[in-house]
């Protein structure tokens, strides 16, 4: 597993859980119940796409885990580049008790674990579904499960980097939980080494699941940057299987390992 020298944030956060009324059996016009969503194979495609959309939010890779908080903590920016943001100013000085940076950290934590919960829901539903429910059979089912497991691993890994100590520090305190089932309201906190072991386990399983698609069936979609990113080459099975460069693919999983 690659090593990252990242600031350790000793912050205890609570996940907030929301409940809905059992008697309300009417779906909002812009939402679909999980039962309806997973009735067909296409619903699994939509659910996976929804996970990618959630990960692109400003709380995660749309800002904080890319050019936002993560870059501030790595001291990428000069002081005068971030003085207008009190949250980032506090982060740069590792002053995590300030209200503004607390709000940012809480949003990363809650949004990250929400993504993980959605990955777990998708995995459990797909594993319980016969491969005949998917247009491309076992190939598609395995690809969806593989991507979801790899995304779950990556999300845990980035939460670990922010909220737990480095292995090299020798600190074996247990800081974050690792969720693999849905629903699950509680999992015990684990040490950094324990989390990394689970991340590696998920990634190894994911690599095996996506391998046939990315290295045998649709190798052309991985052949060049144009094919991976631009979709200039038609993928076997349709558009869902194209543009692998913007999805969790075999090469990306190996890079994480």
Regions found by a protein language model. Give the residues of each.
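Conserved, well-structured interaction surfaces
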Residues: 45, 86-163, 184-194, 204, ...
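Bacterial N-terminal signal peptides that target proteins for export
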Residues: 1-7
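Surface-exposed intrinsically disordered loops and tails
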Residues: 217-243
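Aromatic-residue-lined binding/catalytic grooves and analogous aromatic/hydrophobic interfacial grooves
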Residues: 21, 204, 251, 256-257
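Membrane-proximal, proline-rich intrinsically disordered regions
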Residues: 4, 20-71
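Bacterial Sec-type N-terminal signal peptides, specifically the leucine/valine-rich hydrophobic h-region
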Residues: 14-17
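Short, flexible, mixed-charge acidic loops at enzyme active sites
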Residues: 165-179, 222-225
């Amino acid at each position: 597993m690659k090593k990252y020298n990242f600031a350790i944030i000793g912050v205890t956060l609570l996940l907030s859980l929301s409940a809905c009324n059992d008697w309300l059996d009417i779906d909002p016009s812009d939402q679909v119940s999980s039962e309806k969503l997973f009735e067909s194979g296409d619903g699994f495609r939509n659910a996976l796409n929804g996970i990618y959309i959630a990960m692109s939010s400003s709380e995660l890779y749309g800002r904080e885990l890319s050019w936002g908080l993560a870059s501030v903590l790595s001291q990428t920016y000069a002081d005068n580049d971030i003085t207008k943001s009190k949250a980032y100013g506090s982060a740069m000085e590792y002053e995590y008790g300030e209200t503004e940076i607390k709000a940012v950290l809480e949003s990363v934590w809650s949004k990250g674990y929400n993504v993980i919960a959605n990955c777990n829901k998708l995995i459990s539903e797909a594993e319980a579904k016969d491969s005949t429910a998917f247009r491309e059979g076992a190939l598609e089912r395995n690809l969806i499960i593989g991507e979801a497991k790899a995304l779950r691993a990556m999300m845990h890994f980035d939460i670990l980097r922010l909220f737990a100590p480095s292995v090299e520090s020798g600190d074996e305190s247990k800081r974050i939980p690792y969720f693999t089932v849905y629903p699950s309201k509680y999992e015990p906190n684990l040490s950094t080494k324990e989390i990394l072991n689970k991340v590696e386990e998920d990634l190894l399983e994911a690599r095996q699941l996506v391998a046939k698609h990315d290295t045998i069936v649709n190798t052309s979609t991985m052949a060049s940057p144009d094919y991976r990113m631009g979709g200039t080459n038609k993928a076997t099975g349709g558009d869902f299987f194209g543009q692998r460069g913007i999805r969790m693919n075999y090469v990306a999983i190996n890079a994480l390992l």
